[in-house]
Amino acid sequence: MFDHDVEYLITALSSETRIQYDQRLLDEIAANVVYYVPRVKSPDTLYRLVGALFRSQFIVQLPPLRLLHIVKDVFLWKLEVSEPTLPISKFYLVWNAVFESHRATWNLSQLMVLDGVLVTYPSFKQLNNAYFIDESSNKTALYYRNWKLQLFSPIWAQLWNTAIVRANLSIQHCLLIALALLFNQSNRSALLHGVDVSWNLVTEKLLDLLEEYVHGIVQPMEIFSTDSVLSTNLNHLASCLTSSITRSNEATLVNSVRKLERICRYLSDTVASLKEQQLDFKFQNVFILIILALKELSAMNMTILPNHKDTFYSMICLSLFHVHVLTQKIGTVGFPSYDYVYDNLVTYFIVMDDLSKITTVLELMKRNNTKQDPNKLVFYINFLNKITNYYGCRIRLPFITEFIEPLLHFDVFFSGKTGNTLDIEIKESIHTLTITVLSIDSSYSSQVAQWQVSRILVYLKMSMDQFIAGKLSANQILLIFGHLSTQLPSLHNYNKHLLRDSLHETYIRIVNVKNPEKKNVLIECLIVQIAFINNPHHLIGWLNICLQLINTHNKKLLQQLWEMVSSLESSLAIDWWYTTVLSSQSSKL
């Protein structure tokens, strides 16, 4: 019965009579191919069956990506189920004979048959390593290599270069997916070696394919459609795209970052309209692909012409800006490619050493829904902080007024409210930025110094109030005072009473706070500031006040007070310590 069914299938596939292939007939023949081909016992019969399949109208009538999966299923069944029929080596020998005997020009369907075989190589390798299913001493593995390099690559290039492909988007997509499915990180160079095609065009079309996929990412996907196949193979698309990028010219690279920025912008808008539970692995995989593509583009920066570099890096920056919503949700821990792209980006803007060009990028981000999108806001603030921190003394008041000052009035920062995790991150990021800008060397700009004077005491008071209200931690308030206390003396020329006022505001809060632990932390903030008093009379006065505030049993605070006093290199302060503190301690023994 089995042999009769196989012969019937061979006859059906070999028929030159025009058959009306409806969906039912296609499904029936497909099921028979998957069932019978792996089970045939005779090499001669298998040769006739595979040959009939390879030259049949049936494979032409099938959607190419479905055909690929049918052939893939045939080989996976043969490899995984290990039917007690033909040995693996003879099974592959027959397929090789069919491929080599075909002298006519290959069509798209025949290439998809070959691709369906080739995509099973990882499974073959894994199973053979584990169970030694191939007794041919590596000959079967060699078939895979030869089929890929000697058949698939040149035939794929030949089809890609034909006029019909350039005019048919559907065929383009099938060929691109067929190519991408064979890519992984280890075989990138070998697969493309000697392939005579325009890699500029391939890169362009791969990005078009990605863009189309992203536009339909939330829509239901029809089985064996382009989007459906891509959804489970974006890692292969990433390897293919990054390989193609390395073979593309400068104009294509610049156009590629423009396309990626557009894709990222659309992705950001899509994610913003979805609920948390709708963000499945498809979004994570797209995010990873985009970052890998940006990494490859960043690595090609030396090929970008000087007059295009600003645009090139601006597009990379905006791409990261748009997808920061996914960065927040997915995270970048264990993903060094993201750090590479971001660090490379920041390094460019630093090495460029031209703040006016950076303001263009900042303006684009600022106008791009930053206030309404907290994820974009986080990226914007952190990037702004990096730039401000580096350019430091070259920052001028218009820059502060335009980009930094508005952030200091955000409710999440000014009120210190603790909402969701994102609110907390925004608040902490603005605090970091505020410390950075208030720490700029004021000697380079009197306008910046005057702005710092107008802001620093307000900020310190606000920070202490937020700490007392439980909206800032002890470590955070100590960090703030540790950084900004050093700035108070340099602003003395613009406000002679700034340090005095800061000490007074700190003292008032120490006296009024009821929580003893918070009181001790604020005393630490006071100690930090006392170190910068220049007037000897005022110094001793504040040392006495500080000592009165400290509980005599609090060894930690006394130790910190001593460390501060000893660091002053002031004989007056040292004398005060020995005559006031130590004598007081001795009298209580």
Curated annotation (Swiss-Prot):
It is found in: Peroxisome matrix. Keywords: Peroxisome, Peroxisome biogenesis. GO terms for molecular function: protein-macromolecule adaptor activity. It comes from the Eukaryota. A motif (Microbody targeting signal) lies at residues 587-589. Required for peroxisome assembly. Present with 538 molecules/cell in log phase SD medium. This is Peroxisomal biogenesis factor 8. The lineage of its organism: Eukaryota, Fungi, Dikarya, Ascomycota, Saccharomycotina.
